C-alpha cells in the first residue's frame, strides 16, 4: 500500500460542516469529532509546550469541535494535560464541552487513595484537584476512568450525584466498563433515584471490535452515548503508514511500533483500494464508518498539530457512504 497523498483541509467547510449529536439520553450536544487531549504536555510532541497546546485548542474551537476529552492522569506528568488546558481555555471555556476522568493511579498527586479510587472520599479529592488544574468551576462530563473493584458502584454513583447537586459536575460517564458492569450501574442508579451515566468510553476501531460483543449492545439498550477511544488505532487509519513503516515522530512509531508491524496489511491494502476507487482518503472512510455505528456519538481523535485537527474536523464531511458501503468496510475487517 502506498502512502496517501496529503489532501489539504477544506477550511471553508469548518463550522458549517460539523455535525452535532445528543450524548446519550441527555440534553448535552457534542460535535461528532472530538479532541482527545492525552497528548497535551506529552514529551516529544508539539503539544508538550503551552504554546503548542494553545494552537491545537484554538484550531479545534475554530473548527467547530466542542467535545474536549482529557483525564487527570494525562500528560508527561500526572495532571499536566489538565493544567495545559486550564491555561489555554480562558474566556473560551464556555465554547466547549469539557470532559475529564478520574480513577487511575495518580502516584500520590491527589493524595493517599489506598487504591479505592471510586470511593466517596477519593472522588471529592479528585474533582477538586481537576477543577483547580482546569481553572474552571464545573466539569461538563466527569467520567470514571476504569472500574474500582474495591468500592461498591452504589457509593461511586452517590458521590457523583452529590457533585451534580453542587453544580461542580453537569453529567457523568464511565470508561472501560464491561457490558455487565454497564447494566449493573444502570440498575443501581435507577434503584437509588440517582442521575444515570450518559456515556461510555471503550476502545473501538476497525481493528479492535471487541466492544461489539457486549459493550455496544449494553450501550444501545440503555441509551448511552458511545465515545470510542483509539478510533484511528493510534493513527494507523490516517493513511500515513504502510508495510515499511510511517512517520518517525508519530505516536505509533515512537511508542507502539508493534501496532504497525503486526497490522493485517493485506486487509489494509484492500481497504486502501476501496478508498482509492471512491477518490476518498482512508481518514474520511474511517470516520464515516465509525459515525455510522449505532449509538456512536463522537469520534475522539488526538492531535498534536493544528493541521491534524483541521483534517479530522472536515473528514466526516468528505464522504456520504451508502449502507452497502458501510457493510463492505465492516466485512473487510470482520474479526
Give short role names for the model-derived ranges.
Residues 2-96:
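N-terminal binding-site loop/beta-alpha segment at the start of enzyme catalytic domains
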Residues 47-60, 118-135, 182-187:
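Short, acidic/polar
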Residues 38-51, 109-124, 145-151:
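Active-site mouth loops of central-metabolism enzymes
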Residues 9-13, 153-334:
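Beta/alpha (TIM)-barrel catalytic core signal, keyed to glycine-rich beta->alpha loops juxtaposed to Asp/Glu
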Residues 59, 63, 133-134, 167, ...:
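Structural motif
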Amino acid at each position: 500500500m502506498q502512502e496517501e497523498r496529503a489532501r489539504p483541509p477544506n477550511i471553508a467547510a469548518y463550522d458549517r460542516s460539523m455535525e452535532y449529536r445528543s450524548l446519550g439520553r441527555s440534553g448535552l450536544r457534542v460535535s461528532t469529532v472530538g479532541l482527545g487531549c492525552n497528548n497535551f504536555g506529552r514529551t516529544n510532541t508539539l503539544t508538550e509546550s503551552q504554546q503548542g497546546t494553545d494552537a491545537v485548542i484554538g484550531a479545534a474551537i475554530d473548527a467547530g469541535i466542542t467535545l474536549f476529552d482529557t483525564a487527570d492522569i494525562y500528560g508527561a506528568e500526572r495532571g499536566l494535560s489538565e493544567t495545559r488546558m486550564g491555561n489555554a481555555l480562558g474566556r473560551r471555556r464556555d465554547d466547549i464541552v469539557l470532559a475529564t476522568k478520574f480513577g487511575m493511579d495518580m502516584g500520590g498527586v491527589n493524595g493517599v487513595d489506598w487504591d479505592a479510587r471510586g470511593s466517596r472520599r477519593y472522588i471529592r479529592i479528585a474533582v477538586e484537584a481537576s477543577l483547580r488544574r482546569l481553572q474552571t468551576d464545573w466539569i461538563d462530563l466527569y467520567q470514571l476512568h476504569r472500574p474500582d473493584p474495591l468500592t461498591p458502584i452504589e457509593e461511586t454513583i452517590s458521590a457523583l450525584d452529590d457533585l451534580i447537586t453542587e453544580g461542580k459536575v453537569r453529567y457523568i460517564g464511565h470508561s472501560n466498563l464491561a457490558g455487565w458492569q454497564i447494566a449493573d450501574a444502570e440498575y443501581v442508579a435507577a434503584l437509588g433515584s440517582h442521575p444515570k451515566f450518559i456515556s461510555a468510553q471503550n476502545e473501538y476501531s476497525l481493528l479492535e471490535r471487541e466492544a461489539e460483543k457486549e459493550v455496544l449492545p449494553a450501550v444501545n439498550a440503555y441509551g448511552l452515548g458511545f465515545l470510542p477511544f483509539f478510533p484511528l488505532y493510534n493513527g494507523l487509519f490516517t493513511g500515513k503508514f504502510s508495510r515499511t513503516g510511517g512517520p518517525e515522530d508519530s505516536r505509533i512509531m515512537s511508542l507502539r511500533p508493534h501496532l504497525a508491524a503486526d497490522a493485517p496489511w493485506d486487509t489494509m491494502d484492500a481497504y486502501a483500494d476501496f478508498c482509492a476507487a471512491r477518490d476518498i482518503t482512508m481518514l474520511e472512510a474511517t470516520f464515516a464508518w465509525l459515525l455510522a455505528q449505532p449509538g456512536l456519538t463522537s469520534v475522539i481523535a488526538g492531535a498534536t498539530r493544528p493541521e491534524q485537527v483541521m483534517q479530522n474536523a472536515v473528514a466526516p464531511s468528505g464522504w456520504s457512504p451508502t449502507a452497502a458501503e458501510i457493510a463492505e468496510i465492516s466485512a473487510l475487517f470482520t474479526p
